[in-house]
Design a protein with these regions (language model features):
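Membrane-proximal helix-loop-helix units in multi-pass membrane proteins
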Residues: 92-147, 162, 166
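Membrane-interface helix-boundary motifs at transmembrane edges
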Residues: 7-11, 41-45, 64-77, 132-137
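Alpha-helical transmembrane segments of multi-pass membrane proteins
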Residues: 60-63, 85-90, 150-157, 161
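Alpha-helical transmembrane segments that form the membrane-embedded catalytic/substrate-binding core
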Residues: 110-118, 145, 149-168, 172-221
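Membrane-interface helix caps and helix-loop-helix hairpins in membrane proteins
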Residues: 40-43, 69-72, 95-105
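Short, highly charged, low-complexity non-transmembrane loops/tails of multi-pass membrane proteins
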Residues: 231-255
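N-terminal membrane topogenic signal
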Residues: 5-23
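Cytoplasmic-side transmembrane-helix entry/capping segments in multi-pass membrane proteins
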Residues: 73-84, 107-110
Length: 255
């Protein structure tokens, strides 16, 4: 496949992916507004759900903003996977309410986030360690970087959820802390069904799912890298070449 053909294929796939994501997002917004107009939830819940729609758009834009700022290009499959994950987590989970309709939706996403963010870590790891001699040492170093990168992203996501719940505790329940609340006592303390707190259980189970997903993905990848180091190129980032302006012909050349 020629470079131009590859570029055309990439362009078509991205256009289709953007179109599908946009249709799902628009449908989710329309679905949310209709539910609000039917009186299924209050205005605060409408604002909360629409906020996640904005966040979904921002996350998709961030993928290509990173590529633009650092003059890199992620593998096409990774770009599409990141967009799909953003739509599934933020749009599907919140606008369409799949967190409530599908009991395991949250844990499924946290488990799948392990392999997804591991691939991002592998891409950055192969770039950072590109000058390291090939061999078992490099394969282990790249895999370790990807492992820590994935866990770090999972940790930061939990920090984000906690921050949102803390700043706006009335309408947000990202860490399911409201699920275990029975009532409030006269002394100001809360009466809960779970001594450890439902929020703590949700946070730790999310981190464990991310850990398990990361480990299950990276162990076979490490074995593959050790046997065939060239396979690391599957996750390699591409350097975007600067566009060079064509030199204007001199008067003599014009003649």
């Amino acid at each position: 496949m020629t470079h131009s053909a590859s570029a055309q294929t990439r362009k078509r796939v991205l256009i289709v992916s953007f179109t599908v994501c946009a249709l799902i997002l628009i449908g989710g917004i329309a679905f949310t507004v209709c539910m609000y107009l039917d009186g299924d939830f209050a205005r605060g819940e409408l604002v909360r759900r629409l906020w996640y729609a904005v966040l979904c758009i921002a996350m998709i834009a961030a993928i290509f903003l990173v590529e633009l700022l650092f003059r890199i290009r992620f593998p096409l499959a990774l770009e599409v996977s990141l967009m799909a994950f953003a739509v599934a987590a933020l749009c599907g989970g919140n606008l369409y309410g799949l967190y409530g309709y599908v009991p395991f939706w949250d844990k499924l996403l946290h488990t799948l986030s392990g392999p997804l963010f591991s691939i991002v870590g592998l891409s950055f790891g192969t770039l950072i360690l590109k000058d390291m001699p090939e061999g078992v040492g490099k394969a282990a170093a790249v895999a370790l970087f990807a492992f820590l990168f994935s866990l770090a992203v999972g940790y930061l996501w939990e920090v984000f959820e906690y921050s949102v719940d803390s700043l706006m505790p009335g309408g947000y329940n990202n860490q399911r802390w409201q699920n275990g609340v029975v009532g409030q006592l006269e002394n100001g303390n809360w009466e809960v069904t779970e001594p450890r707190g439902s929020g703590l259980i949700d946070t730790m189970s999310d981190l464990i799912c991310n850990f398990v997903g990361t480990l299950c993905f990276l162990v076979p990848v490490l074995v593959l890298f050790v046997k065939k180091p060239s396979r690391a190129e599957l996750f390699a980032l591409e350097r975007r070449q600067k566009r060079t302006k064509k030199a204007r012909p001199s008067p003599e050349e014009r003649e």
